[in-house]
């Protein structure tokens, strides 16, 4: 059992055999080792299995689904939230709720609101309070927000509850709620009201594929002004820098290809899930309505100057993008020609 006994046992065997006392000592160690192994097996089998709950159905009614509650404190999210009212959470509710909390986790200081639809943000807002933050998030795309998930990072107030009460949402999740806000929500029986004091994203994300699975680290990238490189003649103003960094936090959580348009530290429009960056840009500008003077954030580089030329038509003031295209020179030249300031982040923000 123990390497420390090898020499003494070998010497004893060479000298004529083991004494009864030595055999007893070795037997005691051997049985003790076996007992320890059995105890380890017992403890492993006695551990509580992860909490498993069946859901009404999956992404679609014809699909079965379930949720497994993870071990705390490795991660904290919708499965650990307290549900105050409403129907049981659906598969899509869990996905959208987590997407909202992931994006919301980017904003630690200012009151913030994120509205998610189909696992991608359709509105993000900051404000002096959560009511103002919600209004700004809703104004990004009030049409898409209908039937979405609302997440805020501060206590839900009566003022905010009155605003939410006027629109159909699936979920409202907040760290806590005023008693008055819960009373207002109680009239909306189908609204799921969740409280979660802290959100902790898992360190790794895992996706199953045919024949195996994929795993990767979570995207903990935190873009700061010092990381930016400005290759254009025109530089971003302080306001454009802060607006661009805000837009980058949003584009990071938007399905690729993604374009976010912002101005004066407010998100104006979000376009995601497009297979063409040109189309993503076009949709973002159509939703922005008046994009003149705005800052554009792109989750990946522009492979051609066509998107820049489209932005010039809309009088875009500045761009923040990863850079790294073999045609970066042409893109920079187009920006200089159209007097657009541009900053490179040095890394992209794909999300699939």
Where are these regions (language model features)?
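Short acidic-hydrophobic, aromatic-tinged amphipathic segments that line or gate anion-handling sites
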Residues: 1-2, 194
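Internal, active-site/partner-interface "lid" segment
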Residues: 3-47
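ATP-dependent carboxylate/acyl-activation modules
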Residues: 9, 33-352
């Amino acid at each position: 059992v123990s390497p420390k006994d090898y020499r003494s046992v070998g010497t004893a065997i060479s000298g004529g055999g083991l004494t009864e006392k030595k055999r007893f000592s070795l037997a005691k160690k051997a049985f003790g080792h076996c007992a320890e192994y059995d105890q380890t097996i017992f403890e492993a089998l006695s551990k509580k299995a992860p909490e498993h709950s069946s859901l009404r159905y999956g992404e679609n009614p014809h699909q079965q689904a379930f949720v497994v509650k993870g071990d705390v404190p490795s991660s904290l999210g919708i499965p650990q939230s307290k549900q105050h009212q409403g129907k049981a959470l659906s598969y899509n509710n869990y996905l959208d709720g987590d997407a909202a909390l992931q994006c919301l986790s980017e904003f630690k200081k200012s009151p913030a609101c994120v509205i998610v639809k189909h696992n991608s943000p359709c509105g993000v807002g900051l404000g002096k309070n959560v009511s103002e933050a919600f209004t700004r998030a809703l104004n990004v795309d009030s049409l898409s927000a209908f039937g979405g998930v609302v997440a805020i990072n501060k206590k839900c107030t009566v003022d905010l509850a009155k605003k939410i009460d006027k629109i159909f949402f699936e979920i409202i999740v907040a760290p806590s709620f005023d008693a008055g806000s819960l009373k207002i929500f109680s009239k909306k029986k189908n609204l799921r009201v969740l409280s979660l004091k802290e959100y902790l994203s898992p360190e790794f994300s895992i996706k199953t594929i045919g024949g195996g699975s994929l795993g990767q680290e979570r995207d903990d990238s935190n873009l700061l002004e010092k990381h930016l490189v400005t290759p254009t003649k025109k530089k971003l103003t302080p306001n454009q820098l802060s607006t661009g960094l805000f837009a980058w936090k949003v584009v990071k959580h938007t399905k690729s290809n993604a374009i976010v348009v912002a101005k004066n530290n407010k998100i104006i429009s979000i376009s995601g899930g497009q297979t063409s960056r040109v189309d993503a840009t076009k949709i973002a500008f159509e939703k922005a309505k008046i994009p003149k003077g705005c800052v554009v954030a792109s989750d990946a580089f522009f492979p051609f100057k066509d998107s820049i030329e489209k932005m010039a038509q809309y009088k875009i003031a500045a761009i923040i993008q990863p850079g790294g295209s073999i045609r970066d020179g042409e893109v920079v030249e187009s920006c200089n020609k159209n007097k657009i300031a541009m900053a490179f982040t040095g890394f992209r923000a794909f999300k699939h």
